[in-house]
Amino acid sequence: MLLHNKTLAGKALAFIAEEGYVPSMREKFLGWNVPPEYSDLVHPHWRAFPAPGKHFHIGLAIIYSMLLIMSLVGNCCVIWIFSTSKSLRTPSNMFIVSLAIFDIIMAFEMPMLVISSFMERMIGWEIGCDVYSVFGSISGMGQAMTNAAIAFDRYRTISCPIDGRLNSKQAAVIIAFTWFWVTPFTVLPLLKVWGRYTTEGFLTTCSFDFLTDDEDTKVFVTCIFIWAYVIPLIFIILFYSRLLSSIRNHEKMLREQAKKMNVKSLVSNQDKERSAEVRIAKVAFTIFFLFLLAWTPYATVALIGVYGNRELLTPVSTMLPAVFAKTVSCIDPWIYAINHPRYRQELQKRCKWMGIHEPETTSDATSAQTEKIKTDE
């Protein structure tokens, strides 16, 4: 609950700023257990809020423990099956494996948060904060650009099925680019060259600083917002828009030809293959939508921190976007398990106990062989 008595808050903040932390108020305000030498990790904004009860921390620890298990099981399963199945070792699926790796990197944050929740402070202080933030920065920006790469691949594969498919070398170059993309805004705050990492919310998680009231912080947050969110979003919307346009034009052409030939349908084996690819594209679009749902609240919080009304930024309102982001990294692999036809076939073969029933299709085999030939070029 937000402290409404402004006079009391002002006195508390003044005393805290002078003394570093206040033993007599340990059960009342955030930052009560942060010693003076680490006081820079806690922005004065958070010190005006009552410290959350232990049950809040335990609740978060339980939630993140469940998310950790789901993420590791799901993403490791994706990497295992896509990497060891010949029919799934295609350039397009290299992006899926890359996305799963970024999701696992995000999962590395979760044990740190669980431990921090029981300690009611950030584990490892400044070093722990930096490590936690680096994991979040790499995984968040990596997921964004990998989603953009998947959108580009789906557009090329479906719009130009004969000569538009990426080969393995091209896919590897794009994946390497996604790793390059995450580097600047991960390393600069880490080295404190531009921006910095600091605690947020319940002070058991860390991210880049979006509360310091100076021009340097405003410019940094604006740039990372454009770099990590806006640019990937533009690419994703562009490629999926073109993909939808291509599908509509293709279907329109088939209807017109069928009408001229006085037949019901002109669907061939190639069109059945295209239908399977469209199904996979729908999976990719679903994951993009989940990404948007997860990271838009976090981006909004950061912008409010530098440009908006900071009274809206309570510990709870800044912790929830982090939970959403972690949840999506756990859901991604299960979306594929439910919807990806060839992935379901492999799961059916290797994990019969899951009770999956996905029939073998000629179109899937043809698609796999086509991509395999393209890979070897």
Curated annotation (Swiss-Prot):
CDD domains (alphabetical): 7tmA_photoreceptors_insect
Highest taxon of source: Eukaryota
Localization: Membrane
Protein modification: Phosphorylated on some or all of the serine and threonine residues present in the C-terminal region.
Extracellular side stretches: 1-56, 120-132, 196-219, 307-314
Gene Ontology MF: a single term: photoreceptor activity
Keyword Protein biosynthesis: no
GO CC field: membrane
GO biological process terms held by the UniProt record: detection of light stimulus involved in visual perception; phototransduction
Tissue specificity remark: Expressed in the dorsal region of the retina and sparsely expressed in the ventral region.
Keyword annotations from UniProtKB, A to Z: Chromophore, Disulfide bond, G-protein coupled receptor, Glycoprotein, Membrane, Phosphoprotein, Photoreceptor protein, Receptor, Retinal protein, Sensory transduction, Transducer, Transmembrane, Transmembrane helix, Vision
Residues with N6-(retinylidene)lysine modification: K326
A Pfam family recorded for this sequence: 7tm_1
InterPro entries xref list: GPCR_opsins, GPCR_Rhodpsn, GPCR_Rhodpsn_7TM, Opsin, Retinal_BS
UniProt membrane topology term: Multi-pass membrane protein
Transmembrane segments: 57-81, 94-119, 133-152, 171-195, 220-247, 283-306, 315-339
Disulfide bonds: C129-C206
Keyword Protease tagged: no
UniProt topological domain (Cytoplasmic) ranges: 82-93, 153-170, 248-282, 340-377
Glycosylation sites: N5
Family: Belongs to the G-protein coupled receptor 1 family. Opsin subfamily.
Record function comment: Visual pigments are the light-absorbing molecules that mediate vision. They consist of an apoprotein, opsin, covalently linked to 11-cis-retinal.
Protein known as: Opsin, blue-sensitive
Gene this protein is translated from: BLOP
